[in-house]
Amino acid sequence: MTAKWEKQEGNKGVLTFEVSAEEFEQALDQAFKKVSKDVQIPGFRKGKIPRGIFEKRFGVEALYQDAVDIVLPSAYTKAVEEADIFPIAQPSVDIDQIERGKELIFTAEVEVKPEVKLGEYKGLEVEEESVEVTDEDVEKEIENVRERHAELIVKEEEAIENGDTAVIDFEGFQDGVAFEGGKGENHSLEIGSGQFIPGFEEQLIGKKAGEETEVTVTFPEEYHAEDLAGKEAVFNVKINEVKAKELPELDDEFAKDVDEEVESLDELKKKKRNELETNKKQEVENKKREELIQKASDNVEVDIPEAMVDTEVNQMVREFEQQLQMQGMTLEMYAQFSGQDEDALKEQMREDAAKRVKTNLTLEAISEAEGIKPSEEDIKAELEKMASMYGAEVDQLVQMLGGNTETLENDLKVKAAIDFLAENSKTK
């Protein structure tokens, strides 16, 4: 294999590579075996035509395309390895020379991963944030626990107050015409939750069970349904039932009911304080790392190829699809609900995708500059962790990955680069 790489403008270049005459001849042999199975010539059984007769009738050139299809994928892969380049998109390949008995010569226009010129990334400064948890924080968390364990008690005659839950039937009209998605029955609505359109919940305050009322609202300009965005609508609302929250008494029994690991309210407060401190430390550390990554990325000079952004956008769409599936939705259902098709979604994601690409390129460049490489032990530990998550053996997981742990190794390099940024940062 002879490969030659000529870099051109931007992130593109031309890769010239050859396949030996011997390899080309072997590919022609394979091509003949494939093609001859379907060739019918008088005097010969189908698939039994001699090679010489075939070539005399059709010419050896009839085998060229199939031979190229056979030899090109592996030849291109070897050429990429020899030239030590990292393609980011499918190449445009031309045949420069194809003749039996001679080398097969290809040229490929290839777009490659861009060069990254690192700026300052060591000793970056970040604000030091407090991880202190106050008594007020603990009391607020305890109140949240009380809220989660509250009982809903039916209010017979009392009017709706903020924080109550109203069970309602409703139907919305625009210019006197009912609109799609604007109707519901026995819907439980917590007043003050912000679950409905702004202004809707407030207009129910003071009403009682059994009453019917009209609620007039204006849909937000950014509302997902374009035909309703910014428009006024009137809802006919029937209040079927009103429920009020009854919070449990704040005592030792409450503490034991909500957490079997504690024996008193003081123990529950202590445990919640420890949990809050752990979470606060993690939040502060995560924020610090995100800030360091952003600063290092801002200091980088790189020409981001559109092909890499396209790939990242597609990945983001797949991730979004998985999130929708967890909610029992499909991308098509989301498009109908939001009025935003896949192309519009991709365009919306494009800016974030470009940022993600730049961030990854930055972290990869830092890992290269600092010689950061995961050890065999690191890779094994990560595989064991992943296998445990999927309930599989490590060997099974490696098989699922097609025997290729390159993506996993790259992820570990990126994580290690983030650790490096954090370990070499300063606080101010």
Curated annotation (Swiss-Prot):
GO terms for cellular component: cytoplasm. Its EC number is 5.2.1.8. One of its GO terms (biological process) is protein unfolding. Keywords: Cell cycle, Cell division, Chaperone, Cytoplasm, Isomerase, Rotamase. The keyword Electron transport does not apply. It is an enzyme of class 5 (isomerase). Residues 163-248 form the PPIase FKBP-type domain. It catalyses: [protein]-peptidylproline (omega=180) = [protein]-peptidylproline (omega=0). SUPFAM superfamilies: FKBP-like (SSF54534), Triger factor/SurA peptide-binding domain-like (SSF109998), Trigger factor ribosome-binding domain (SSF102735). InterPro entries: PPIase_dom_sf, PPIase_FKBP_dom, Trig_fac, Trigger_fac_C, Trigger_fac_C_sf, Trigger_fac_ribosome-bd_bac, Trigger_fac_ribosome-bd_sf, Trigger_fact/SurA_dom_sf. Consists of 3 domains; the N-terminus binds the ribosome, the middle domain has PPIase activity, while the C-terminus has intrinsic chaperone activity on its own. HAMAP family: Trigger_factor_Tig. Belongs to the FKBP-type PPIase family. Tig subfamily. Involved in protein export. Acts as a chaperone by maintaining the newly synthesized protein in an open conformation. Functions as a peptidyl-prolyl cis-trans isomerase. This is Trigger factor. The gene is tig.
